[in-house]
From Swiss-Prot:
It is found in: Cell membrane. Belongs to the UPF0324 family. This is UPF0324 membrane protein GSU2818. PANTHER family: INNER MEMBRANE PROTEIN YEIH-RELATED, UPF0324 MEMBRANE PROTEIN FN0533. It is a multi-pass membrane protein. Keywords: Cell membrane, Membrane, Transmembrane, Transmembrane helix. GO terms for cellular component: plasma membrane. The chain crosses the membrane at residues 11-33, 53-72, 79-97, 107-129, 136-158, 193-215, 227-244, 254-273, 286-308. The keyword Membrane applies.
Length: 310
């Protein structure tokens, strides 16, 4: 068997394993990262495309596990954290970019990705800033690298600090960049954390549209942004479950399938972390991104533990 066939065979076997209940989110991510860093992913472009599609479908499926009332209440409870968090993250990110002398566009993209929704936010903001392809790529690679770290670190920190599932879910939803990493970290922590974290994260993601439009007006451009369709799908799924409670068992089965699809998604996400992606990041953007992420994570957790959040 030549090297190409061996890579394909290994990838296919591990992918199939991730579709079974025997593999959890953390194991799937580690297997994917190992493949990516060992240059053993035979289909990097297809992996990137299908991981995004599968993630969006999985998030919609998770909506069948929640009532619309739960979604609305969680969104209402976290909205001010989202508004304050986004504003402070953008301001601190701007300051850190100046401090570390990161390129203006790269710094802005990293800050925007950290504040709202990782790669989706970066992709939406890049045309507004007229960012070059290499600036966008560096910002995406930086956020992607930290997403992978968050999947492993957040559950460890949560258990170490003995956070309850509600606090961990809100913290993850507010402090982790991408939706995939939020659902991965929270699903490893518990069902309640997953439900809360996903809803809080999607509440943050809705802010892509108004923030991009505001930036476009400031820049004098015509770039528009729309709320991602999978967020509407998530709300629609929760509405269907609420309107048709007699099929609750079926909706629960759909939500269970969605959770297993998330395991497959995280394997694909990990497999996309190649050596080229790591090399592309560079020291200044990485230092800015890590500093911003640590500050946001720490301050968010402190805010959640203060008396007013009880």
């Amino acid at each position: 068997m030549n090297g190409s066939n061996l890579r394909r065979g290994t990838f296919t076997i591990l992918l199939a394993l991730c579709a079974t209940p025997w593999v959890g989110t953390a194991q799937a991510l580690v297997m994917g990262i190992a493949l990516g860093l060992l240059q053993a992913n035979p289909w990097p472009r297809q992996t990137a495309r299908y991981s995004k599609m599968l993630l969006q479908a999985s998030v919609v499926g998770l909506g069948f596990g929640l009532s619309l009332g739960e979604v609305i209440q969680t969104g209402k409870d976290s909205i001010w954290y989202s508004v304050i968090g986004i504003s402070c993250t953008l301001l601190v990110g701007y300051g850190l970019g100046k401090l570390f002398k990161t390129g203006t566009n790269t710094s802005a993209l990293i800050s925007f990705g950290t504040a709202i929704c990782g790669g989706s936010a970066i992709a939406a903001m890049a045309p507004v800033l007229k960012a070059k392809s290499d600036e966008t790529a560096v910002a995406l690679a930086t956020v992607f690298t930290l997403n992978s770290a968050a999947l492993l670190l957040f559950p460890l920190v949560g258990h170490w600090l003995q956070l309850d599932q509600n606090t961990f879910g809100v913290w993850s939803g507010l402090a982790i960049h991408d939706t995939s990493s939020v659902v991965g970290a929270t699903s490893a922590y518990g069902a309640t954390a997953l439900a809360i974290g996903t809803t809080v994260k999607l509440t943050r993601a809705i802010w892509i549209a108004p923030v991009v439009m505001a930036a476009s007006l400031i820049k004098g451009g015509e770039q528009q942004a729309r709320i991602p369709l999978f967020i509407i799908g998530f709300l629609g799924a929760a509405a269907i479950r609420t309107l048709l409670p007699s099929y609750e068992h079926f909706w629960g089965e759909l939500a269970g399938v969605a959770k297993q699809c998330l395991v497959v998604t995280l394997f694909l996400v990990g497999a996309g972390l190649s050596r080229e992606v790591v090399k592309q990041v560079g020291i200044r953007p990485l230092v800015q991104a890590v500093s911003l992420w640590v500050l946001v994570s720490a301050l968010t957790l402190v805010a959640l533990k203060l008396p007013w959040s009880a």
